[in-house]
């Protein structure tokens, strides 16, 4: 089965068109085996690490301050080796133009190329599927879920780079009748040599201006491009106690506490002439979230759930003024009935 998609957009601030498209062919529906070719000419946040879902990607771009223009050609194939194990292999060529002023190893870096092969594995314990027509649909996402990404920079074109990059994550969910739901995510990454800014790890923070959303698995009090790393390890913890105080049709507040911590490192930091910090010491923050303050049904299909959260930066990287360490955010979730 052949599937086609595409998009066209226009940037009001940079006055440039963004566009892309994808052609996908399903080889074996029962194993979700497919191959695809995608092209895009777009703008993306510099140094993003593990994959986010669509809403989180939009949220990250909303608060990000450093971007790159990317022209990419990508050939990709993926399938389920077994019910819980999925394999994805891709070959990508990118022409990258930083939309920020930056010098690398003493020379201005106006553009570069990034050509790579990437292998991704996802293992979801207990994941369940069903076939709806010719489509394989996930009915239970699995718990815990492990991911592993290996990227090999090929460096076969001029002004491109050879490197090895690894990222891995583990997500755990536990339920308790008295204490509610516990979510834990552990993630880390490593690059084996000095590379330009956009090929390293940054963008772990999601603190915006006066208005921003809570984005899961990011640091809510950290500015998007505050730190730069070629190695990192993060832990995100959230305890949701549920709606134990009030329950009404449009008002079912759920109380949660959160604690996030991360550490990183960067070799040859002097190679990069741009403002950043290195996360040599643990970065810590804690938060209180009230989800589902407003619960709005839409078309009898989903609930739009609005809430609020407050997070406090503390430890080695806290600021002198209390208000600078505080981040107030809006919680937005969509839940199917």
Task: For the regions a language model picked out, list residue spans one by one.
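Exposed, low-structure sequence patches enriched in small/polar residues
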Residues: 1-337
């Amino acid at each position: 089965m052949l599937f086609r998609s595409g998009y066209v957009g226009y940037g009001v601030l940079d006055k440039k068109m963004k566009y892309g498209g994808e052609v996908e062919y399903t080889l074996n529906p029962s194993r979700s085996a497919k191959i695809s070719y995608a092209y895009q000419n777009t703008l993306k946040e510099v140094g993003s690490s593990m994959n986010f879902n669509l809403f989180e990607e939009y949220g990250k771009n909303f608060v990000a301050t450093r971007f790159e223009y990317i022209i990419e050609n990508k050939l990709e194939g993926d399938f389920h080796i077994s019910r819980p194990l999925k394999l994805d292999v891709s070959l990508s060529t990118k022409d990258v133009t930083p939309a920020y002023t930056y010098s690398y190893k003493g020379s201005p870096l106006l553009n570069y190329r990034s050509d790579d092969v990437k292998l991704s594995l996802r293992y979801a314990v207990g994941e369940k599927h069903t076939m709806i027509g010719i489509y394989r649909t996930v009915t239970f996402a699995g718990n815990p879920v492990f991911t592993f990404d290996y990227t090999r920079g090929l460096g076969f074109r001029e002004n491109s780079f050879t490197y090895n990059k690894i990222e891995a994550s583990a997500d755990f969910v536990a339920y308790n009748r008295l204490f509610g739901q516990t979510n834990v995510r552990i993630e880390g990454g490593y690059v084996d040599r000095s590379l330009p800014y956009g090929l390293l790890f940054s963008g772990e923070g999601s603190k915006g201006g006066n208005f921003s959303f809570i984005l899961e698995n990011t640091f809510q009090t950290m500015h998007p491009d505050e730190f730069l790393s070629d190695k990192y390890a993060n832990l995100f913890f959230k305890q949701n106690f549920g709606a134990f105080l009030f329950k009404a049709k449009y008002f079912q507040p759920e109380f949660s506490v959160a604690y996030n911590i991360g550490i990183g490192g960067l070799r040859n930091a002097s190679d990069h002439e741009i403002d950043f910090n290195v996360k040599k010491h643990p970065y810590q923050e804690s938060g209180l979230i009230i989800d589902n303050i407003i619960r709005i049904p839409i078309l009898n299909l989903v609930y739009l759930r609005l809430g609020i959260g407050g997070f406090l930066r503390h430890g080695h990287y806290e600021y002198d003024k209390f208000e600078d360490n505080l981040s107030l955010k809006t919680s937005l979730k969509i839940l199917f009935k």
